[in-house]
Amino acid sequence: METQIRADEISRVLKEQINQYNKKIEVSETGSVLSVGDGVARIYGLENAMAGELVEFPGEVFGMVLNLEEGYVGAVLFGEDRHIKEGDVVKRTKKIVSVPVGEALLGRVVDALGNPIDGRGAINTPHSRIVETKAPGIVYRHPVEEPLQTGIKAIDALVPIGRGQRELIIGDRQTGKTTIAVDTIINQKGLNVQCFYVAIGQKQSTVALVVEKLRAAGALEYTTVIAANASDPAPLQYLAAYSGTAMAEYFRDTGRHALIVYDDLTKQAQAYRQLSLLLRRPPGREAYPGDVFYCHSRLLERASKLSADKGGGSLTALPIIETQAGDISAYIPTNVISITDGQIFLESDLFYKGVRPAISVGKSVSRVGGAAQIKAMKQVAGSLKLELAQFRSMEAFAAFASDLDKASQQQLARGRRLIEVLKQPQYSPVKVEEQIIMIFAAGNAFVDQYPETDVKRYEKEMIEFLKNKHSDIIKTISEKKAIADDTKKALLAALEEFKAIFQPSNK
């Protein structure tokens, strides 16, 4: 018995199959790998590729186009190159390298491409930004006038930092550069400043320690850590600083304040040198490529204080540079010194003497200066730098002199007590009003009569005494940000009152 198929059934089956057919034709511009090795690939056939474009290799490995040659393009890889071989197909994405930005990144640890690496799930944010953007022009900027308090007495008094400034932290390894940066981040708690810590070429254990310190201080909730570790490919170490800046710019451009720390740009320059030599770019001084200055200047120029028309936001940058045996005249240190608005120079000799933070008063400078200080700090810290500089020169002279007159001995004794006042343990920033009161007490000779070993105890007990008995003085300085005549009289009277009850250890 023959099965008869009706014509309407045939048409129905055909329609169903047509509706179910969903195969898509994907059109993409492709090229092929000519050679690959050391994290760099040469690709033939991507005639329309853009500089900085993201390209896709087999196995979901991505790269970035850096060289545009006549017959090929040079790309750096953001992943392992072990499984990529000659002849592999490379696709254009037609996208410039970008990273996610927004509030969702606060409190997270991400890699140089914005992917989370803290094991706390995906980052959900609708916003993204290109990693390399043009710095704001002159007409869109506002002079740096608003202080960014670091909580470190020696910095806030002697080399003040303003919102929108670029202040270099420079010194040999193990002199406390990272500690200053982390202290500054911790001190932004409650000040509505979003912080970004970019770790470039650091050991994973070091980055984990910084993250733990931030978490313990309650600072991680307003901080994003961007980590390109020593084990990561050189392209990620090069890119991390630009990615972090793009994330921070989101807050600056929405009228808020951000702080970014680059720890450190020496390793970024070394990663860029490695990439440039592998891409066969001509080497220059110390084998760095000719555009290594531009690599850093275009990064640091993005830190700025915007005008009120642009929302009045700010991005403050604290780049870190590591020197070799205190040589600040090397290529990368001189480059970054010339780009930034001042530097905080840390000396190994001071560090080993127990002066911490080991800030060299003579070599450290802020080109913004008093504009980034509140009036009260200007009033008390005006003569401090001069006194410390005179002490350092007198100390050097005293090392060779056998007999000193009484005035010189007094100057040396006073200088040593001022140094004690400026000493500070790590991860313990001090409120600006407390800094002002302590520097005021030292400037008015209230600590001169006590042994050096008593200065820290004097500071602690004196601040506690004022908080308990004269909290109105601290409140007035905090609110008015200046020391009026009546406040000065009240503070002097309170210090005299404390002087009567303080017990030095030698009595």
Swiss-Prot record:
Enzyme's top EC category:
translocase
Q: Which reaction does it catalyse?
A: ATP + H2O + 4 H(+)(in) = ADP + phosphate + 5 H(+)(out)
- EC id: 7.1.2.2
A single Pfam family it belongs to is ATP-synt_ab_N
Binding locations of ATP: G171, D172, R173, Q174, T175, G176, K177, T178
Membrane disposition = Peripheral membrane protein
Asked if the keyword Nucleotide-binding belongs to this entry, the reply reads yes
Q: Extract the InterPro entries matched here.
A: ATP_synth_asu-like_sf, ATP_synth_asu_C, ATP_synth_asu_C_sf, ATP_synth_F1_a_nt-bd_dom, ATP_synth_F1_asu, ATPase_F1/V1/A1_a/bsu_N, ATPase_F1/V1/A1_a/bsu_N_sf, ATPase_F1/V1/A1_a/bsu_nucl-bd
Instruction: Cite the entry's keywords alphabetically.
Output: ATP synthesis, ATP-binding, Cell inner membrane, Cell membrane, CF(1), Hydrogen ion transport, Ion transport, Membrane, Nucleotide-binding, Translocase, Transport
Subcellular compartments: Cell inner membrane
Q: Which family does it belong to?
A: Belongs to the ATPase alpha/beta chains family.
Q: What is this protein called?
A: ATP synthase subunit alpha
Provenance organism: Bdellovibrio bacteriovorus (strain ATCC 15356 / DSM 50701 / NCIMB 9529 / HD100)
